[in-house]
Amino acid sequence: MTTRLTRWLTALDNFEAKMALLPAVRRYGRLTRATGLVLEATGLQLPLGATCIIERQDGPETKEVESEVVGFNGQRLFLMPLEEVEGILPGARVYARNGHGDGLQSGKQLPLGPALLGRVLDGGGKPLDGLPAPDTLETGALITPPFNPLQRTPIEHVLDTGVRAINALLTVGRGQRMGLFAGSGVGKSVLLGMMARYTRADVIVVGLIGERGREVKDFIENILGPDGRARSVVIAAPADVSPLLRMQGAAYATRIAEDFRDRGQHVLLIMDSLTRYAMAQREIALAIGEPPATKGYPPSVFAKLPALVERAGNGIHGGGSITAFYTVLTEGDDQQDPIADSARAILDGHIVLSRRLAEAGHYPAIDIEASISRAMTALITEQHYARVRLFKQLLSSFQRNRDLVSVGAYAKGSDPMLDKAITLWPQLEAFLQQGIFERADWEDSLQALDLIFPTV
């Protein structure tokens, strides 16, 4: 009896060992519909944001396409692929990434940490620079909980951007969030490159979202340069990738900046562009049936913008900071575009680039009259503020009467402010212009302003 029991227990142990070698059970659903950008699947219960794998045929081989749950209707899941969908068949099997399909899947974990410095990655953390995957064991979720506003450090310190017009006339504070409003071809990328090279920050995170592939390479190699790239992390999600990957790229760039901020470092975050991020969300929202609102943008777009922007800024007292510059494309130089209007309301200031100035060869083409830094008054002295006000008054007076002065119709002495503007105009114009490879730090910028207004 004992021998038989021993034999039976041994057989049971062998059976258990063989069972352990079998592959884990994978729940899967089936693809039932493909319309435009969205695929529909049934048979799985997964939360929004969960990652799925769809089987596709590539000749005799079966390959996998990564997708994400962007919505559901009853038992139907709406999926948006992150890759090319060619070869996907009706009824193709759909797996949850964790293999269970029970809704218990955790959020995405993407690489973080100092090992990312000098690297160029896509929105999913995969290398685009031809190098191996980042050598880091540190990972983190893509989305973090909202920051308690009462725990943020106030904006108290000036950020030296290396650009004279910004330093002196549109002073930016460490932890401020600024918008760079510009149409196409007015020097936006060049100005961003100058700030990336010359800004006094520990780390630079660049998010190139929805841009042309040629512009991505040009920005990294020529505008950012080797010096800027050494202390930078570049996340690139060009225009030809999935809208989901473009949105994820913006969130990932922000998450990397948050990670460095939490390490006590001061980060410069450059996002080019916030408009392409909004357009990517519009593509997704319209594809899953959300009704359009203002100029074709669904309401979810205007909810996503502040959720992204509010993640930047100062950390807790004694911690690091994220100073962010978001570019906003103004189509046809329309400052009332809905995205531009929404961004202006949620940012801490805006720098407007003028096509008129760019066409006149005036670089950087910053329209000082239309630009503002909301944190500036808390950062500068009364004397500095008085000089800035006088500078803007003289600039505005000259611009309003430029035609009269040009044709000789203005009689000197009619307007004391205009008389002073005409006298100082060469100095004002020279102050606002700066070479691409010329650095003007904070002290030099103030000294240049002092030379124009020594008695103010």
From Swiss-Prot:
GO MF, one example: identical protein binding
Question: Which SUPFAM superfamilies does the record associate with it?
Answer: P-loop containing nucleoside triphosphate hydrolases (SSF52540)
| NCBIfam families, per database record | FliI_clade1 (TIGR03496), fliI_yscN (TIGR01026)
Identify the residues that bind ATP.
182-189
**Gene behind the chain:** fliI
Question: Which organism's genome codes for this protein?
Answer: Salmonella typhimurium (strain LT2 / SGSC1412 / ATCC 700720)
Q: What does this protein do?
A: Probable catalytic subunit of a protein translocase for flagellum-specific export, or a proton translocase involved in local circuits at the flagellum. May be involved in a specialized protein export pathway that proceeds without signal peptide cleavage.
Keywords, alphabetical: ATP synthesis, ATP-binding, Bacterial flagellum biogenesis, Bacterial flagellum protein export, Cytoplasm, Hydrogen ion transport, Ion transport, Nucleotide-binding, Protein transport, Translocase, Transport
> Catalysed reaction(s)?
ATP + H2O + 4 H(+)(in) = ADP + phosphate + 5 H(+)(out)
SMART domains documented for this protein: AAA
Source taxon at top rank: Bacteria
UniProt-recorded name of the protein: Flagellum-specific ATP synthase
Q: Name one GO biological process term.
A: bacterial-type flagellum-dependent cell motility
The family database entries (PANTHER family) matched by this protein are listed as: ATP SYNTHASE, FLAGELLUM-SPECIFIC ATP SYNTHASE
Q: Where are the transmembrane segments?
A: none
